Amino acid sequence: MNDRPFTHVIELLHKAGLRPTRQRMALARLLFDEGNRHLTAEDLHREAKNANIPVSLATVYNTLHQFTSAGLLREMVVEPGRAYFDTNLTRHHHFFFEDTGEIEDIPHNLVSISQLPKIPKGTAISKVDVVVRLRSAEQVKN
């Protein structure tokens, strides 16, 4: 058993060029120790409070944006005013369940795009993100 439970988090932060502060390490463990997931700053703040980690919502926001800038997370905006953070950095797309706000990964090879519009001169496509929005079948009928 590892005598230093934060060793992997410290290495992760160092590789990303971030100083491993106590709060960053605690939030990184919450984020990355459970595998791939999607969550908002409010979700992570709630998890931190439940784990007795003393951190403000502003610190959670700042840390998530630092992790995103360092390449540890991917930020997604799927509804106005609400950003989700994705720990899965591989190529993939998403289902967004409008009823619950949950997000589920779709492997990139299961989505096919046959044609894109002509892009403006002097630009290049950096990536294409697909978000498939889902509702319960009853809501779609109405």
Model-assigned labels for residue ranges:
Residues M1-D33:
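Intrinsically disordered, low-complexity serine/threonine- and proline-rich regulatory segments
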Residues S69-N142:
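Non-DNA-binding regulatory cores of transcription-related proteins
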Residues T40-N52:
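DNA-recognition alpha helix
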Residues V60-A70:
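Basic amphipathic alpha-helical segments that dock to polyanions
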Residues A26-R29, D43, T59-N62:
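Amphipathic alpha-helical interaction segments
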